[in-house]
């Protein structure tokens, strides 16, 4: 279990606390500039005390933020918003760089994990392509495969947490479906998943817990039905919101 205690970064993110249980999918939502990326960067340890981060991220009573990044990488995977490296390697070489180090794992387990992940994101025909020739959506699927392999339990028994910052942004509708299948597959291994997300209808459907941020402040926290209310969303996003039910499933409609 992960306990975030009083995490903050100046005026960009005021102190907030919450927990993420094993297998729980937690979505962080809010308008642009509300502090979503700041929160995820602080929890991941890539934003540090030098940048003004305070608070604790406790995983099994150990503070993630006091560990070297090399040790953090065994416990959590972090995917920031889209970037493409300047170096040029094939997809399979990039995925090899993403594999966890230090664990005593067999080649067969690595092969099995890689095969499962690349099938989930449909990369089977892209393994020998240069990452520099991929479309934005293809590259994002490669990045998702890499970070999920970093925490995949059969090859990294120490993993506890997967952090994804706006992972659906470069994906089309069909590829978004693959993303949520991948998230479910990771969560099913007992790993908590923390996702910054803009598609509130996906959050309403897939999130176990939701944090709604506004101007660096935690507006509300709880189950999706409790947080994604017409009144709360209208207040935070400054737009009219209606919640409707179609075929027994709730949807949000924005003006």
Swiss-Prot record:
SUPFAM superfamilies: P-loop containing nucleoside triphosphate hydrolases (SSF52540). It catalyses: an R-cob(III)alamin(out) + ATP + H2O = an R-cob(III)alamin(in) + ADP + phosphate + H(+). It is found in: Cell inner membrane. Keywords: ATP-binding, Cell inner membrane, Cell membrane, Membrane, Nucleotide-binding, Translocase, Transport. GO terms for molecular function: ABC-type vitamin B12 transporter activity; ATP binding; ATP hydrolysis activity. It is a peripheral membrane protein. GO terms for cellular component: plasma membrane. Pfam families: ABC_tran. Signal peptide: none annotated. Belongs to the ABC transporter superfamily. Vitamin B12 importer (TC 3.A.1.13.1) family. NCBIfam families: PRK03695.1. This is Vitamin B12 import ATP-binding protein BtuD. It comes from Vibrio campbellii (strain ATCC BAA-1116).
């Amino acid at each position: 279990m992960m306990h975030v205690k009083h995490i903050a970064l100046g005026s960009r993110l005021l102190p907030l606390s919450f927990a993420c249980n094993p297998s729980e999918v937690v979505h962080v939502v809010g308008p642009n500039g509300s502090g979503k990326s700041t929160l995820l960067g602080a929890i991941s340890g890539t934003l540090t005390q030098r940048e003004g981060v305070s608070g604790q991220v406790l995983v099994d009573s150990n503070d993630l933020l006091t560990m070297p990044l090399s040790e953090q990488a065994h416990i959590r995977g972090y995917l920031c918003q889209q970037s493409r490296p300047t170096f040029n390697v094939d997809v399979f070489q990039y995925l090899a760089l993403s594999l966890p180090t230090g664990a005593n794992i067999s080649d067969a387990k690595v092969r099995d994990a890689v095969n499962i992940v690349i099938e989930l994101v449909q990369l089977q025909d892209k393994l020998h392509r240069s990452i520099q020739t991929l479309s934005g959506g293809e590259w994002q699927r490669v990045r998702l495969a890499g970070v999920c392999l970093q925490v995949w339990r059969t090859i990294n028994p120490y993993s506890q947490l997967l952090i994804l910052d706006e992972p659906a942004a470069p994906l089309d509708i069909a590829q978004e479906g693959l993303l949520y299948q991948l998230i479910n597959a990771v969560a099913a291994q007992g790993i908590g998943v923390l996702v910054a997300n803009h598609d509130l209808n996906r959050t309403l459907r897939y999130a176990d817990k939701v944090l709604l941020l506004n101007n660096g402040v935690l507006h509300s926290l709880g189950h999706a039905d409790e947080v994604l209310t017409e009144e709360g969303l209208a207040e935070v996003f400054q737009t009219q919101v209606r919640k409707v039910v179609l075929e027994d499933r709730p949807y949000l409609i924005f003006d």
